[in-house]
Amino acid sequence: MRLVFAGTPAVALPSLRALIDSPRHEVVAVVTRPDRPAGRGRKIKPPPVHLLADEAGIPVLSPERPRDPDFLAALTDLAPDCCPVVAYGALLPREALAIPRHGWVNLHFSLLPAYRGAAPVQRTVLAGDDLTGASVFQIEPAMDSGPVFGVVTERVRPTDTSGDLLDRLADSGAHLLAAVMDGIDDGTLQAVPQPAEGVSFAPKLTAQDALIDWTLPAVAVDRLTRAAAPAPGAWTVFRDRRIKIGPVRLGAQNVPDELAPGRLVALADGAVAVGTGTAPVLLDEVRPEGRGPMKAADWARGARLTDDDLLHAPAERVSAAGSPAGAGGAP
């Protein structure tokens, strides 16, 4: 088939490579988001999919809006049989959906109808699910609601970050997407409507969502730090400045009894423990505001922790007794 592939970030690269390498299909063009500032220098850079298309000698379309008349005309001239999509990053108008003979087919990183939306992998890790997967479905105007051509399942490991899990799903999903293209091409594959039961949604994980509440159980803190890695990054406040917290570890040993939520202690072996609403957790990596990632033990030595130090939410003052200042008392 003649394919026009739509995708933008690195997670789409395995799928694009699989389709480029397929002897049964020809990727005649790639649609991606326009070049944007990236990195610490905020230099204008093409997205990863654009770079791979350039390497492969494939024409690239980068419309500001997919409903732009020039883009719709160019897509019509390409006469695609099907348009596979992986993390393109923009809503497709009805006019675009009607152009390919077999429509637009999307790789989504959940077992639909669960976790429709922008952040299925992050929400999977945050919920503590032990099974997830990827689905390939026909795009319809309603978000992630179209009939499904096929799925692949993936176990969620106890230490998975969102990045870890997404990398595996990107690889297994690429094989699934290529197989679906084959099935559509030879007419052996029909999409099945999604069930009405089990629908859930996965909105983007914001910076506010990634703020750690140290009064929550240790398992909830663990899930949040893994769900927010690598982005947007779980965070808290230390000495009036933000600090990002990498994935924590459960099962801290030899920690003082009843370590209050947010309280820090440097252990004899160099580890750094933090109190939560249940058991303490161990910090492995932190990123102080304005600095790069560093080992928690090195950060703690440099910070010279005191008994009064606390990780907390913004603008939360803490009394010497360990409770928020003013809590339960008269103003």
From Swiss-Prot:
InterPro entries hit by this protein: Fmt, Formyl_trans_C, Formyl_transf_N, Formyl_transf_N_sf, Formyl_transferase-like_C_sf, Met-tRNA-FMT_C, Met-tRNA-FMT_N
Top-rank lineage group of the source organism: Bacteria
Keywords for the protein's UniProt record, in alphabetical order: Protein biosynthesis, Transferase
Residue numbers binding (6S)-5,6,7,8-tetrahydrofolate: 110-113
Pfam (any one): Formyl_trans_N
Enzyme class: transferase
Disordered: annotated segments: 312-331
GO cellular component: cytosol
Transferase found in the keyword field: yes
Entry GO MF terms: methionyl-tRNA formyltransferase activity
Catalytic activity from the UniProt record: L-methionyl-tRNA(fMet) + (6R)-10-formyltetrahydrofolate = N-formyl-L-methionyl-tRNA(fMet) + (6S)-5,6,7,8-tetrahydrofolate + H(+)
Enzyme Commission no: 2.1.2.9
Role according to the record: Attaches a formyl group to the free amino group of methionyl-tRNA(fMet). The formyl group appears to play a dual role in the initiator identity of N-formylmethionyl-tRNA by promoting its recognition by IF2 and preventing the misappropriation of this tRNA by the elongation apparatus.
Family listed: Belongs to the Fmt family.
HAMAP family with a match to the protein in the record: Formyl_trans
Protein name per the record: Methionyl-tRNA formyltransferase
Source organism of the structure: Frankia alni (strain DSM 45986 / CECT 9034 / ACN14a)
